[in-house]
């Protein structure tokens, strides 16, 4: 265990977190494509540490519904405030970008839009539909906000039939007031539960970040809660602080602990578990579709 000094969260990263940036012309080509189509990605907006690696392999996680979130989670680098109006042409442009990139597994996420009556569910559905038309053989994964628990909003997404529905619980319930003050742990579990009730053929997925003060026992309890609502896929990664104004890092979790979490997850019955320091919700997301769903 490597812990950060109390009150700083700035201890030097351990060796297992040192990462060499890839050298590839595809990084700039991917950035230009996204800029030309006026698209946001969570890779850029959330300052993801895997951005260079993903762009080098010509993949990206599209972020729809603007670049401004109505919530202010303490771990997240996405800007918060008053969001802009919905861009009705965005689904078409997302599909065009995915087609040009030649994606076989497309991941779409969004900011939280509590200002919209449906939370943006209709825009998710429109994006899924556009992707189906542009890339009939692609696997489509959506990572959504909680839509304030609205079953009608979730039903709109379910009717569009994504292959994977992802909603992250992010952390253990004890830490929600500090980490996700505007969210609710039980509501997030219920979102995953409702999606399975609406369409049992849609794979459900959730993710946790560790290193924010949780215990191993608390992580296992969350994993058990996720299995209780029939969650199929789990990701666990190290929280890395985007800036000094964000949530402090309490611990750098060693690789062997991630291996242990992955083994426990498989024992609990998850179809697929990705756990590691740099694992994020959509990092190497296509591995599930290849290994479990048979998409080549």
Curated annotation (Swiss-Prot):
One of its GO terms (molecular function) is 4 iron, 4 sulfur cluster binding. The keyword Transport does not apply. Gene3D superfamilies: Aldolase class I (3.20.20.70). Binds 2 [4Fe-4S] clusters per subunit. One cluster is coordinated with 3 cysteines and an exchangeable S-adenosyl-L-methionine. Its cofactor is [4Fe-4S] cluster. It catalyses: [[Fe-S] cluster scaffold protein carrying a second [4Fe-4S](2+) cluster] + N(6)-octanoyl-L-lysyl-[protein] + 2 oxidized [2Fe-2S]-[ferredoxin] + 2 S-adenosyl-L-methionine + 4 H(+) = [[Fe-S] cluster scaffold protein] + N(6)-[(R)-dihydrolipoyl]-L-lysyl-[protein] + 4 Fe(3+) + 2 hydrogen sulfide + 2 5'-deoxyadenosine + 2 L-methionine + 2 reduced [2Fe-2S]-[ferredoxin]. It is found in: Cytoplasm. NCBIfam families: lipA, PRK05481.1, PRK12928.1. This is Lipoyl synthase. It comes from Moorella thermoacetica (strain ATCC 39073 / JCM 9320). The gene is lipA.
């Amino acid at each position: 265990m490597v812990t950060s000094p109390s009150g700083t969260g700035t201890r030097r990263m351990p060796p297992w977190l040192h990462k060499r940036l890839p050298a590839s012309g595809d990084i700039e080509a991917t950035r230009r494509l996204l800029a030309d189509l006026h698209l946001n990605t969570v890779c850029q907006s959330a300052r993801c540490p895997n951005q260079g690696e993903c762009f080098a392999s010509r993949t990206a996680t599209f972020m729809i519904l603007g670049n401004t979130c109505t919530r202010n989670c303490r771990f997240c680098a996405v800007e918060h405030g008053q969001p802009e109006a919905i861009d009705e042409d965005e689904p078409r442009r997302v599909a065009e970008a995915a087609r040009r990139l030649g994606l076989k597994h497309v991941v779409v996420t969004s900011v939280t839009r509590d200002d919209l009556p449906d939370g943006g569910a209709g825009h998710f559905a429109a994006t899924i539909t556009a992707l189906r038309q542009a890339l009939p053989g692609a696997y489509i994964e959506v990572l959504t906000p909680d839509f304030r628990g609205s079953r009608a909003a979730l039903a709109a997404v379910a009717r569009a039939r994504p292959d994977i529905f992802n909603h992250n619980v992010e952390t253990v319930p004890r830490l929600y007031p500090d980490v996700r003050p505007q969210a609710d742990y039980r509501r997030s579990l219920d979102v995953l539960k409702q999606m399975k009730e609406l369409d049992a053929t849609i794979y459900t997925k959730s993710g946790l970040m560790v290193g924010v003060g949780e215990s191993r026992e608390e992580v296992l309890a969350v994993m058990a809660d996720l299995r209780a609502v029939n969650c199929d896929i789990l990701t666990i990664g190290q929280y890395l602080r985007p800036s000094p104004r964000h949530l402090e890092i309490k611990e750098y979790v060693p690789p062997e602990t991630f291996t242990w979490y992955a083994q426990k997850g498989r024992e609990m019955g998850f179809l697929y578990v990705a756990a590691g320091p740099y694992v994020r919700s959509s990092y190497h997301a296509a591995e599930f579709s290849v290994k479990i769903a048979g998409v080549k």
